[in-house]
């Protein structure tokens, strides 16, 4: 079973309160989502492997550590996941960025992939999947499957706000994928919105209805 990490750093929780507020405008919402993503990225990358190298400083030679091993990739789920990309890239600017787009079939209500563009060497990378909201888990599960189908074995899912239903759905479908969240909210309502949540993250990021 995958692990769930709740990142409850005071700065994240403060900024989370601001994005929950219905009076927060799109610009501030975008800035805050970026800042929260950056802060979450610190914990998401905590277990990256290191190797020791020798470098020369202005006053001598020393051994120091750098990140080694598997390369990283970032895959936002379109469109709301785009709001988290820049924050993660500030921490790992060398990461490649792919994209997965989904729409909901009006008859089956199941997510359908309409776009998937991943780095050519995606099989060699550890992939961080980004989506501000983990509600039913349908979009996350479809995205994780799409990436796995293209040969990726190592992934993490990073969401800002989640709920028990979404977490359970991802753990059932993808027990090998760890989940990182800033909050686990109470439940889903009858319209599949997280309660208390923060509304539609995509609409609030981009000022659409």
From Swiss-Prot:
Pathway info: Pyrimidine metabolism; UMP biosynthesis via salvage pathway; UMP from uracil: step 1/1
Catalytic function, reaction form: UMP + diphosphate = 5-phospho-alpha-D-ribose 1-diphosphate + uracil
GO process terms (BP): UMP salvage; uracil salvage
Cofactor(s) annotated in UniProt: Mg(2+)
Sequence intervals crossing the membrane: none
Residues engaged in binding uracil: 194, 199-201
Domain of life: Bacteria
Enzyme Commission number(s) from the entry: 2.4.2.9
Positions with a binding annotation for 5-phospho-alpha-D-ribose 1-diphosphate: 79, 104, 131-139, 200
Family of the protein in this entry: Belongs to the UPRTase family.
Regulation of activity: Allosterically activated by GTP.
A Pfam family recorded for this sequence: UPRTase
GO molecular function: GTP binding; magnesium ion binding; uracil phosphoribosyltransferase activity
Keywords associated with the record: Allosteric enzyme, Glycosyltransferase, GTP-binding, Magnesium, Nucleotide-binding, Transferase
Function as written in the Swiss-Prot or TrEMBL entry: Catalyzes the conversion of uracil and 5-phospho-alpha-D-ribose 1-diphosphate (PRPP) to UMP and diphosphate.
Protein known as: Uracil phosphoribosyltransferase
PANTHER family: ADENINE PHOSPHORIBOSYLTRANSFERASE, URACIL PHOSPHORIBOSYLTRANSFERASE, CHLOROPLASTIC
Cofactor annotation remark: Binds 1 Mg(2+) ion per subunit. The magnesium is bound as Mg-PRPP.
